Amino acid sequence: MMNRMNRAGRLWWGGLWLLLAAFASAEEAKTTANNPPKKADAGDFIRVRRDAKKTPLAMETAIVHYVPADKGKKSPTVDLVSAFHIGEKKYYEELNKAFENYDVVLYELVAPLGTRVPKGGGNKDSMLSKVQKFMKDTLALEFQLDQIDYTKANFVHADMSAADIAKSMSDKGETWMTIISRMMSYSMAQQAKNGGDDGSMELFAAFFSKNRPLALKRAIANQLEVNDTLSALEGPDGSTLISGRNAIALDVLKKQIAGGKRKIAIFYGGGHMPDLDKHLRADFGLKPGGTRWLTAWDLNDKAVEKKE
């Protein structure tokens, strides 16, 4: 019975990580970082903030500000704005306000070149939309495409189309099945390395919690700190889903800089950021100049804490 529960738990978590990877590109939040190291990791862009008792208080994403390494230059500046695609309404309101201050915001969206997202999101009847609605309702959160205003004049599409992804994957010998298998195998190996805890018991308890959305979000936050499944995609030649799409964004960045834009944001999932960081340093002569953290998920139940 317990073995069946554990297997079911692994399958559930494996499926959840694939969904979160698709929606959020989130990776392991390893450390806090006021001054990102020479080689950035995912913890510089997405982290779980905890109290002294190690209770998760917030899932946070970073806006990392890059400035010219040459002290004689003041521009261009580029901000890597990490996206968590399921979040609090207030989180997206903060992002919308921040985006008003940029000359241009380069955004990810697997769609034909130049695609614009209408206000309130796109097609609500698609299978993906139904999955999103289920997750939104279960976690009591909002979705990025519904809340971010992509109609603003300074928003520029900077991503592959589905056809581009299919061609790139074919050229690299990648398939969706091999990607899924690689990610799940890596995730299970990491679970074994961490004592075999797949989070199934915490998840099971969360479903029966008086505050189910909060309990589920905390369970997911705990798992994000022991899962780095997207790193399994990147090999010596990179991958379509990370470095391939990043290459498109960086090409658009070059064109925007050449066109005179000086204050630029790249709005992409956190899993893309270590590779983008590497290229901003090596190819654009930029370095991190500061980090601002935003709360994507509020995991603090003040009412419960007062009772305890």
Each model region followed by its residue ranges:
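Structured, acidic catalytic/metal-binding patches in enzyme active sites
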Residues: A29-T240, G244, G289-L299, V304-E305
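A cross-kingdom marker for long, charged
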Residues: S239, S243-E308
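Sterically constrained small-residue positions within well-ordered secondary structures
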Residues: W17, T55-L57, I257
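Bacterial N-terminal signal peptides that target proteins for export
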Residues: M2-W13
